[in-house]
């Protein structure tokens, strides 16, 4: 058939719709056709989209309220006093940056903690006993974090406090925090507040007249920021480690807010049940657990160490709000609300007491098997059930959906309507709308990135909603509106509304089955999106569906969507609260606008799927499409004009740009030991996609002419502190005189031994600052077969290089290690290149006049973290 629109002739497909589907009511075979009821073919009015918008905003408001639950300090009978914990927090952070190995960390912070523990011990109730042990372990291990590297530590500091019944205990639960910080930061949220909470919990429990059944070990670990060294030292070497049956790890990926349970287990479902029973203000998600364990978040915690090296199950909690100032100078005690401390203290105290008085702790091996589906409901309570039960529920849900769809197929077939064809076409149209919206958003993201305006939403998150969210929704509506006009012409609005409701069921049934089949507990998420809407549809009275007021129908329909919609919006908040700040420190190679565009598309698809049927019920969608398109285009123009600056120096809510400044002296030695190259300068790394484009106007000498070259040397010839060179490929090297260093690193080959099995073993000795990194690159035809580190099997950090992270406490002897290489051919140029990076984070050598001068030039919306380092390369 043909129609004329604005002078254009449009040929529509020959698509015959039965009279039954056109009129919008059904007639079963063999049943007398009833009088045609009043239809809604005229379509819903313009007020319905407004109602949908108000619905979305109302749900978002409820989520906001649930996340801002105020907890009055001392207002609960848990026994936890947030005011006391806050005093501890303030005093701990008054100690300067507590880098492992520094006097601030190894002496001042340790003495402070020991003093407070002694004060608590003096007030202990006679039913308890406290034992304190200061551990200074030495050890080594390999980890596959950040591409894989090996760690070695010497004489670091842990403080372990055991609270147990008067007559001792055989089993224990471990509570872990760390009091060290990354360089140049006060580390209030990461992780001083957790240590303050643990001190107050220790005081509360030890003064209680209620005896414990099991011991609680409070571990204040002093080297977590050295990539989990402190926890490894405890769990592999401390005699109390054998007592531990479960642990709670307290961490941070943000500053303040609610602490999220984002990892549990492995297996041991009784731990989830313990949290669900004892946490006063729960905040937990199995979805967060499976996202974190997928590795897409570039972070790790002590949970991994206790799980992998101690074979102990546990609970991992972290503050996730305001990650913009995580690991910056803005992570100060005054930014953490007392209510946040109270909430965390109530939860952790409750769970620790529950575990320490539970019979399950001693017999945990009997309850080991199986995973749990768990999630909190707006912070009110935790809903949890065994994963095997979840599997049954999921498959039953899928089967009921299949039965429902099959029944409709039979009914429509008897009535002469080709429902199966419509269903297939509808699924294709839905997929086309998804792909079309994704392509549109990616095109916009690429344009923004090419225009040099990436991260424009970093400080103004609403910009991303207007820019990408509006475009996505407009494209969804446009595709379905075109399908309604030119593909489903002649079909009744009620029939199409029902059809796309069924398509929504099928849409979520597919991931439900796939995730369940993969053993992922997150599948419950999609089960909820099927169960509640389907139940509502089945319970709706036919007169409401076919004859009732559009607003009555809409209200009842939205009421059925409310549980999954609220739960999804709750998770959507968590996704953007976590990932938006991460995109400001994810390196120079990942376009953040493209990643955010993907996230917005994914969340929009989930939130809008059950609204698609309204497109087919509305009289017109033209104004909605135009409004959304104009909003997106206008936002794009404002973004490209530079209207929205990415960073902020606001005192209330700073969102700084992160930059590393390393005053570096590089020395390259030949095979004979001669110095073949030496230079010095300030090596600059920006941790986000914008590089230094926003910094150059403030520091003209810092431009593309001083881009750092990638030398043919391990890790491009620069002293990387962590193996993140694959994430940050753009860096700058501003020439400067050598930094004054009081004590240079002494790196030497002690001996060389030819082994009977044809390998060459090189013995090294290193004496230097508390933090050093060694990079090993075997030459052509040479294989690094073993070494004296980790488990003896070398772990590569890339295709050719091996990364070793070394740290020591206040004092340590020279570090000795060996590597073994096998060479298949005689090489005149040697068999291996070894380089050592030395990092001076504290003391007289940590700064230089040139570094101070450059740092002062950086704008106030940036956070330059600076230190002095050296890079020495040797060939053997």
Curated annotation (Swiss-Prot):
Residues crossing the lipid bilayer are 43-63, 382-404, 428-448, 463-483, 495-515, 520-540, 556-576, 594-614, 624-644
Gene Ontology biological process terms, A to Z: proteolysis
Q: Is Endoplasmic reticulum there in the keyword field? A: yes
* Record: residues binding Zn(2+) 2: 190, 225, 327
Primary location group: endoplasmic reticulum
Q: Which SUPFAM superfamilies match?
A: Zn-dependent exopeptidases (SSF53187)
**Segments on the Cytoplasmic side according to the record's topology features:** 1-42, 405-427, 484-494, 541-555, 615-623
- Lineage, top-rank taxon, reads Eukaryota
What keywords tag this UniProt record?
Answer: Disulfide bond, Endoplasmic reticulum, Glycoprotein, Hydrolase, Membrane, Metal-binding, Metalloprotease, Protease, Transmembrane, Transmembrane helix, Zinc
- Carbohydrate attachment sites? 81, 155, 703
Subcellular location(s) of the protein: Endoplasmic reticulum membrane
Q: Which InterPro entries match?
A: ERMP1-like_C, ERMP1_1-A_TM, Fxna-like_M28_dom, M28_fam, Peptidase_M28
Identify one Gene Ontology CC term for this UniProt entry: endoplasmic reticulum membrane
Q: Which Pfam families does this chain map to?
A: ERMP1-TM, ERMP1_C, Peptidase_M28
Give a GO molecular function annotation for the protein: metalloexopeptidase activity
Q: What protein does this entry describe?
A: Endoplasmic reticulum metallopeptidase 1
What is the organism of origin for this protein? Xenopus laevis
């Amino acid at each position: 058939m043909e129609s004329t629109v604005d002078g254009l002739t449009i040929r529509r497909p020959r698509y015959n719709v039965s009279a039954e589907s056109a009129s919008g009511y059904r007639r079963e075979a063999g049943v007398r056709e009833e009088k045609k009821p009043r239809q809604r073919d005229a379509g819903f009015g313009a007020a319905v989209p407004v109602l949908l918008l108000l619905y979305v905003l109302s749900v978002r408001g409820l989520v906001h309220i649930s996340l801002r639950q105020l907890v009055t300090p001392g207002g609960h009978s848990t026994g936890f006093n947030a005011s006391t914990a806050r005093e501890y927090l303030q005093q701990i952070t008054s100690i300067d940056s507590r880098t492992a190995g520094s006097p601030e960390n190894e002496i001042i912070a340790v003495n402070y903690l020991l003093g407070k523990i002694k004060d608590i011990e003096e007030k202990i109730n006679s039913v308890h006993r406290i034992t304190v042990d200061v551990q200074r372990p030495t050890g080594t291990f390999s980890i596959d974090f950040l591409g894989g590297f090996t760690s070695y530590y010497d004489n670091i500091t842990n403080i372990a406090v055991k609270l147990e019944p008067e007559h001792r205990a055989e089993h224990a639960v471990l509570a872990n925090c760390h009091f060290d910080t990354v360089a140049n930061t006060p580390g209030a949220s990461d992780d001083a507040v957790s240590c303050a909470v643990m001190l107050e919990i220790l005081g509360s429990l030890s003064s209680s007249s209620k005896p414990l059944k099991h011991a609680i070990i409070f571990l204040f670990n002093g080297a977590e920021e050295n990539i989990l060294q402190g926890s490894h030292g405890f769990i592999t070497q401390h005699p109390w480690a054998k007592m531990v049956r479960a642990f709670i790890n307290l961490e941070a990926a943000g500053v303040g807010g609610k602490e999220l349970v984002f990892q549990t287990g492995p297996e041991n479902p009784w731990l989830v049940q313990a949290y669900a029973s004892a946490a006063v203000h729960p905040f937990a998600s199995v979805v967060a657990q499976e996202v974190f364990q997928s590795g897409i978040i570039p972070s790790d915690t002590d949970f991994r160490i206790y799980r992998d090296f101690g074979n102990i199950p546990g609970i991992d909690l972290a503050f996730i709000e305001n990650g913009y100032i995580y690991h910056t100078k803005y992570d100060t005690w005054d930014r953490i609300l007392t209510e946040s401390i109270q909430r965390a203290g109530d939860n952790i105290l409750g769970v620790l007491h529950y575990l320490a008085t539970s019979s399950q702790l001693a017999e945990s091996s009997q309850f080991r098997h199986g995973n749990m589906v768990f999630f909190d409901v707006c912070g009110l309570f935790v809903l949890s059930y065994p994963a095997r039960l979840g599997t049954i529920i999921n498959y039953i849900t899928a089967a009921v959906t299949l039965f429902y769809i099959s029944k409709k197929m039979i009914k429509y077939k008897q009535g002469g309507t080709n429902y199966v064809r419509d269903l297939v076409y509808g699924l294709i149209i839905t997929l086309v709308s998804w792909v079309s919206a994704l392509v549109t958003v990616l095109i916009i993201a690429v344009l923004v990135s090419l225009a040099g305006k990436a991260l424009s939403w970093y400080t103004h998150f609403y910009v991303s909603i207007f820019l990408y969210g509006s475009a996505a929704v407009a494209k969804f509506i446009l595709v379905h509106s075109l399908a309604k006009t030119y593909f489903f012409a002649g079909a009744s609005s009620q029939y199409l509304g029902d059809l796309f409701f069924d398509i929504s069921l099928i849409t979520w049934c597919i991931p439900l089955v796939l995730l369940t089949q993969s053993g992922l507990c997150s599948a419950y998420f999609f089960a909820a999106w099927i169960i509640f809407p389907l139940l509502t549809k089945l319970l709706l009275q036919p007169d409401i569906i076919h004859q009732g007021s559009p607003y009555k129908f809409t209200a009842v329909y939205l009421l059925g969507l409310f549980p999954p919609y609220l739960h999804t919006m709750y998770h959507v908040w968590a996704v953007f609260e976590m990932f938006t700040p991460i995109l400001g420190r994810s390196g120079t190679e990942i376009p953040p606008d493209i990643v955010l565009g993907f996230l917005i598309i994914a969340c929009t698809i989930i939130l809008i799927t059950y609204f698609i049927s309204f497109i087919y019920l509305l009289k017109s969608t033209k104004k909605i499409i135009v409004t959304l398109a104009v909003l997106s285009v206008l936002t794009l123009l404002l973004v490209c004009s530079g209207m929205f600056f990415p960073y902020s120096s606001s005192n209330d809510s700073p969102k700084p740009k992160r930059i590393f400044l390393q005053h570096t002296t590089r020395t390259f030695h030949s095979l004979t030991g001669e110095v073949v190259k030496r230079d010095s300068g300030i090596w600059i790394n920006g941790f986000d996609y914008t590089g230094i484009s926003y910094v150059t106007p403030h520091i003209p000498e810092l431009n593309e002419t001083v881009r750092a070259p990638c030398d043919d040397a391990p890790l491009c010839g620069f002293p990387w502190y962590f193996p993140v060179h694959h994430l940050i490929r753009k860096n700058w090297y501003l020439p400067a005189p050598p930094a004054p260093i009081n004590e240079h690193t002494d790196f030497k080959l002690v001996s060389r031994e030819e082994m009977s099995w044809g390998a060459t073993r090189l013995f090294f000795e290193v004496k230097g600052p508390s933090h050093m990194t060694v990079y090993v690159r075997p030459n052509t035809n040479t294989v690094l077969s073993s070494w004296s580190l980790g488990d003896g099997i070398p772990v590569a950090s890339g295709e050719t290089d091996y990364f070793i992270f070394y740290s020591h406490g206040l004092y340590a002897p020279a570090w000795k290690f060996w590597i073994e290489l096998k060479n298949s051919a005689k090489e005149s140029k040697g068999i291996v290149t070894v380089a050592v990076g030395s990092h001076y984070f504290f003391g007289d050598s940590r700064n230089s006049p040139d570094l101070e001068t450059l740092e002062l030039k950086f704008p106030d919306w940036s956070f330059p973290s600076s230190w002095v380092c050296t890079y020495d390369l040797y060939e053997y």
